[in-house]
Amino acid sequence: LEVVNIVARPDIARQQGVRTVPWMRLGDFELEGLHSPAELRQWAERAGSDAGLVEYYTDLFKHGRLPKALAAIRKYPGHIPALLALAEDPDTELTVRIGVSAVMEDAAGSALLQNQMSALINLARHTDPRVRSDACHFLALTRDQAAIAVLENLTQDPEPAVQAVARDSLEELREYLPT
């Protein structure tokens, strides 16, 4: 544990992107504001686990900290599976689903999303139509030719809402691909 007086060392605060105090890092988690010893212990236990990442991003999205989530994904691209786990869970709250979508939109056309193609295809096969709809959108955001066949199949989904999102996503994807 390293404690830094940011009045004496503002350079360290700038380097770490600290804008509020207290601020701390536990593993990949950056925590702001006051936390009880029990909360800090809980976050320390979560650090380094997949379930902990899911909780971390859920907390960020629920508290309107999208910029922090975007910065974290840019810094730790290996966290993207935690967001896909949130997208895969039909019980994920709407505010969290919106946050996940915003991060995916920010990563549109990037290798970060393209490297998740197999996971996105699995989401497209999910039993829940909301998850399949989100998968359609995410597949279009990959800007990857391989997403076309998956989206074409989803235009025949038994759920009309999924069909509509698949058609829109297919149209969006084709706009970005070279002809």
Where do the PLM segments sit?
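Hydrophobic core positions within HEAT/HEAT-like alpha-solenoid repeats
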Residues: 70, 101-104, 132-137, 152, ...
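Amphipathic alpha-helical scaffolding segments comprising HEAT/armadillo-like alpha-solenoid repeats
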Residues: 53-54, 76-89, 110-125, 144-156, ...
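Structural micro-motif
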Residues: 13-27
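Thiol-based oxidoreductase modules, predominantly thioredoxin-like and allied folds used
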Residues: 1-12, 18
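Short inter-helical turns and helix N-cap capping residues of alpha-solenoid HEAT/ARM repeat scaffolds
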Residues: 91-93, 127-128, 158-159
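Non-catalytic, surface beta->alpha helical segment in thiol-disulfide oxidoreductase systems
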Residues: 25-56
